[in-house]
């Protein structure tokens, strides 16, 4: 494999597979809150939170960790202000104390807090302004969860960066299924081992916690009533989401900015490897395939849209499972196409308990997509949104998610705000 392309793929994995505690959208608000408080220097008595529609959608119904079960935008901002560590970025509230939670409650009860929708070209856009009687500070994050566009204190600029361009990073344009498969077969394990070990450790732990605890609708435990292996692959992935969406304080290694997608591309592969007693190196290579495939699928769709991210992650999971079963590149590609043909209509209506069920359905689509092709069955080019050739189908999904479902996204947000 070309050395430059090899290094690009390693760089993409290092950029995308990062650790986060809690659903990433409320955590981004908490991060903005921690930065704003640090800039102001004191706890504010007035807070203005301006957010894009997709942030409203993804924060409204999800429990924020370390808040005693509280949900929503105000909660995320206030725990960031009272207990956040700005240096920790997506783990900003990982070291919150009981005193911080008490202070959060007091702040929510005493401060003037206003949430406003923000008209923005970015699906991810947060502008948080805090003040006391003497000073004011503002933090603006846009494009990605930790990309600071602007910071000010008393209208004096502290940070001013160019907003991320609404174009795809050139690194990501190099992704193709052929090169992903080649990279996974050839990658030096030491180049990805530390990254993937962290994913295995973190994502296994929260999946197990979801199976042990009582979180949300307990989708994982419901599915696990059936003891067969395909059910367990779905169950453990769903259990991780059960826990994550409902306030579990364990971290997750994310994919494409999403913890749920990180769980979907990893946990079924980890469980399958353990149950089938496969070697660790094979798991590493399968995780390379599933992670890069999910990133490839999401590149044109975008970080936040009306297209459920579990769908693309479930198809990517199917590709990883195919690799674990010694499948060829051809089988892997048909697995992905079949899976996308099954589940691509699932909408994203925000982060919440039902995400776990959508993960289970999407993993099932990945499994079925593989089983179909291994039994001589497939969906063909011309069947709905499927085109001849894997890359053409991936492009169709990208157009559907980014352009075709834009108005759907607005209607979902409108319904959720009623």
Across the structure, where does each feature detected by a protein language model lie?
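Hydrophobic alpha-helical bundle architecture
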Residues: 36-39, 65, 272-285, 295-361, ...
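Glycine/charged-rich beta-loop-alpha catalytic/anionic-binding loops adjacent to active sites
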Residues: 9-18, 55-63, 243-254, 294-304, ...
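Acidic-glycine-rich active-site phosphate/pyrophosphate-binding loop
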Residues: 1-10, 41-56, 228-247, 279-297, ...
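Conserved phosphate/anionic-ligand binding catalytic regions in large, soluble enzymes, centered on
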Residues: 19-35, 250-267, 308-312
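Early transmembrane hairpin of solute transport permeases
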Residues: 27-126, 130
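Flexible, glycine/charged-enriched surface loops at secondary-structure junctions
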Residues: 43-47, 88-93, 115-116, 190-196, ...
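A structural signal for small-residue-enriched, beta-sheet-centric alpha/beta enzyme cores
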Residues: 20-24, 54-58, 62-65, 142-146, ...
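Signature of multi-pass transmembrane helix bundles
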Residues: 108-247, 411-418
């Amino acid at each position: 494999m070309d050395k430059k392309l090899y290094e690009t793929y390693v760089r993409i994995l290092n950029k995308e597979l990062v650790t986060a505690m809690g659903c990433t959208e409320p955590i981004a608000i908490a991060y903005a809150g921690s930065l704003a408080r640090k800039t102001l220097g004191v706890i504010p008595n007035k807070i203005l939170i301006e957010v894009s529609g997709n942030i409203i959608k993804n924060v409204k119904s999800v429990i924020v960790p370390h808040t005693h079960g509280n949900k929503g935008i105000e909660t995320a901002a206030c725990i960031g202000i009272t207990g956040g560590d700005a240096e920790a970025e997506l783990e900003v509230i990982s070291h919150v104390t009981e005193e911080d939670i008490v202070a959060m409650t007091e702040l929510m009860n005493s401060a003037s807090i206003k949430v406003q929708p923000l008209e923005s070209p970015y699906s991810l856009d947060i502008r948080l302004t805090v003040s006391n009687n003497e000073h004011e500070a503002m933090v603006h994050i846009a494009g990605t969860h930790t990309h600071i566009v602007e910071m000010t204190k008393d209208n004096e600029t502290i940070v001013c960066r160019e907003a991320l361009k609404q174009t795809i990073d050139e690194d990501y344009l190099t992704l193709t299924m052929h090169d992903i498969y080649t990279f996974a077969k050839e990658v030096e394990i030491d180049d990805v081992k530390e990254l993937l070990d962290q994913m295995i450790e973190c994502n296994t732990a929260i999946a197990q916690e979801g199976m042990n605890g009582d979180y949300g609708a307990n989708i994982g435990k419901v599915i696990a009533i059936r003891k067969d292996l395909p059910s367990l692959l779905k169950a453990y992935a769903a259990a991780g989401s059960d826990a994550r969406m409902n306030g579990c304080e364990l971290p997750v290694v994310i994919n494409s900015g999403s913890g749920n997608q990180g769980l979907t591309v990893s946990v079924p592969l980890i469980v399958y490897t353990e149950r089938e007693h496969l070697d660790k190196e094979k798991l590493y290579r399968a995780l390379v395939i599933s992670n890069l495939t999910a990133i490839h699928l999401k590149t044109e769709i975008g970080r936040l849209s009306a297209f459920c991210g579990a769908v693309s992650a479930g198809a990517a999971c199917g590709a990883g499972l195919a690799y674990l079963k010694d499948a060829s590149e051809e089988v892997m590609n048909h697995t992905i196409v079949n899976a996308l043909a099954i589940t691509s209509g699932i909408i994203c209506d925000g982060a919440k308990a039902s995400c776990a069920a959508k993960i289970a359905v999407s993993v099932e689509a990945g499994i079925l997509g593989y089983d179909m092709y291994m039994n001589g069955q497939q969906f063909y080019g011309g069947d709905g949104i499927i085109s001849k050739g894997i890359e053409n189908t991936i492009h169709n999904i990208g157009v559907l998610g980014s352009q075709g479902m834009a108005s759907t996204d607005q209607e979902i947000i409108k319904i959720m705000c009623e």
